[in-house]
Amino acid sequence: MSSIPISTEGYDRLMKELERLKSERPAIIQAIKEAREEGDLKENAGYDAARERQGMLEARISYIESRMAQFNVINLDSLSGDKVMFGATVEIEDLDSGEAKRYTLLGPDEADYAQGTISVLSPVARALLGKEEGDEIVVDAPRGRISYEIISVAFEGARR
């Protein structure tokens, strides 16, 4: 079993989600019970909906609990250096278009492209890991090979 990096903030967020999901269990069980009391389960939309919700809830709980044992929790406030690694915020420039992008490299359970966070397992992050400001990388993307220059590497700590 390999370890999965996650920030302290990301771990805390998942723990809160797990607590919330577990607190929803009694209400779903009650909804199933009430729907079952309505009679014929074959044509009972309320029962079907409650069972489906229960299935999704239990699947998410199971997923989070199984990941917990694999997490390597990393305090972003303790990170520093010149090389790109987990927790780094990196600004890169597309050498063809001149377009600049800024990403923070976090664990797969924290990646949110819209928020500027990418998984350390993504192709871009894998190409960046271990590199420094001024280095060039090449990423194989659906539209072809893209060359980037690393403009800056920073460690900004936890995002509050």
From Swiss-Prot:
Instruction: Tell me which domain of life the UniProt entry assigns to the organism this sequence originates from.
Output: Bacteria
Which HAMAP family does the entry mention?
GreA_GreB
One example GO MF annotation: RNA polymerase binding
Q: Which residues form a coiled coil?
A: 11-38
The task this protein performs is described as: Necessary for efficient RNA polymerase transcription elongation past template-encoded arresting sites. The arresting sites in DNA have the property of trapping a certain fraction of elongating RNA polymerases that pass through, resulting in locked ternary complexes. Cleavage of the nascent transcript by cleavage factors such as GreA or GreB allows the resumption of elongation from the new 3'terminus. GreA releases sequences of 2 to 3 nucleotides.
Sorted alphabetically, the keyword list is:
Coiled coil, DNA-binding, Transcription, Transcription regulation
Q: What protein name does the entry list?
A: Transcription elongation factor GreA
Record's family?
Belongs to the GreA/GreB family.
- Which species is this UniProt entry from? Nitratidesulfovibrio vulgaris (strain DSM 19637 / Miyazaki F)
GO BP annotation list: DNA-templated transcription elongation; regulation of DNA-templated transcription elongation
* InterPro entries named in the record: GreA/GreB_C_sf, TF_GreA/GreB_CS, Tscrpt_elong_fac_GreA, Tscrpt_elong_fac_GreA/B, Tscrpt_elong_fac_GreA/B_C, Tscrpt_elong_fac_GreA/B_fam, Tscrpt_elong_fac_GreA/B_N, Tscrpt_elong_fac_GreA/B_N_sf
One short Pfam name that applies is GreA_GreB_N
SUPFAM superfamilies named among the record's database cross-references: FKBP-like (SSF54534), GreA transcript cleavage protein, N-terminal domain (SSF46557)
